[in-house]
């Protein structure tokens, strides 16, 4: 099944940051409703851009969004303390964004996720950086799924992000991801695939056409 994560509630966006700073609930509510009307299956909530204010901003955003949210929320933060606070506030089973194999992030996130009932975005990133082959992606995905399974996260609750990279940098980046996705699905039929699909067209003309084509290929992979 194709699912959409609405990512507009992110304080790295200037208008959202201003709305959060001003506690402009109407702006946030309108944005969330538009994402839901457009078909979002999850609403991502990221309050990390205002340094020193993430906890209070996340709390305000959740208080503002939850009364009108018809879909689950994606709690987006690298800080387990912020996620712990947010997890206790949410009414629907959330998605956590995200864990990776980077040692610092992995070591911080695993204790938080241990025993939690949630969905998890798992980035195919480790301390060596971005993956350079479909085998890299598959190996990292396998490690992430196995480690998350050990702490009670079922495979069906894991959303693997193979880290889509621009074909403007290397023309094989698209086929690399598609090959990896096929291999991941063969190994873990219950796992979900997610990612920043529009990354594929970065730096190129006719981005919408490229994006639509790549989405179709990913859905068929």
Predicted region positions:
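Structural preference for beta-strand elements that scaffold enzyme active sites
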Residues: 2-4, 41-44, 70-74, 93-96, ...
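Active-site-proximal loop/turn and secondary-structure-junction residues that shape catalytic pockets
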Residues: 9-11, 47-51, 79-81, 100-102, ...
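Glycine-rich anion/phosphate-binding loops
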Residues: 19-29, 98-108, 134-146
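N-terminal small/glycine-rich loop or linker at the start of catalytic domains
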Residues: 1-24, 117-131, 199-200
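Catalytic beta/alpha-barrel core
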Residues: 44-50, 71-79, 93-104, 124, ...
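Glycine-rich, proline-tolerant flexible connector loops at the mouths of alpha/beta enzymes
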Residues: 36-71, 164-174
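Catalytic alpha/beta core domains of metabolic enzymes, predominantly
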Residues: 108, 115-221
């Amino acid at each position: 099944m194709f699912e959409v994560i609405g990512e507009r509630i992110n304080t790295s966006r200037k208008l959202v940051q201003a709305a959060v700073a001003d506690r402009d609930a109407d702006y946030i509510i309108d944005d969330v409703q538009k994402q839901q009307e457009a078909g979002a299956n999850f609403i991502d909530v990221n309050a990390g851009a205002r340094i020193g204010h993430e906890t209070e901003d996340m709390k305000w955003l959740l208080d503002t969004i939850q009364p009108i949210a018809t879909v689950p929320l994606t709690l987006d933060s690298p800080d387990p303390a912020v996620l712990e606070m947010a997890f206790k506030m949410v009414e629907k089973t959330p998605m956590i964004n995200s864990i990776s194999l980077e040692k610092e992030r992995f070591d911080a996130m695993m204790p938080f996720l241990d025993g939690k009932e949630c969905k998890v975005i798992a980035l195919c990133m480790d301390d060596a950086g971005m993956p350079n082959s479909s085998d890299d992606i598959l190996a990292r995905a396998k490690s992430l799924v196995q480690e998350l399974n050990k702490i009670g996260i079922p495979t069906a609750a894991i959303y693997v992000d193979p880290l889509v990279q621009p074909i403007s940098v290397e023309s094989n980046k698209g086929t690399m991801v598609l090959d990896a996705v096929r291999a991941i699905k063969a190994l873990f039929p219950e796992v979900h695939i997610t990612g920043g699909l529009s990354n594929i067209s970065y730096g190129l003309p006719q981005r919408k056409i490229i994006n639509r084509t790549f989405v179709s290929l990913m859905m068929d992979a």
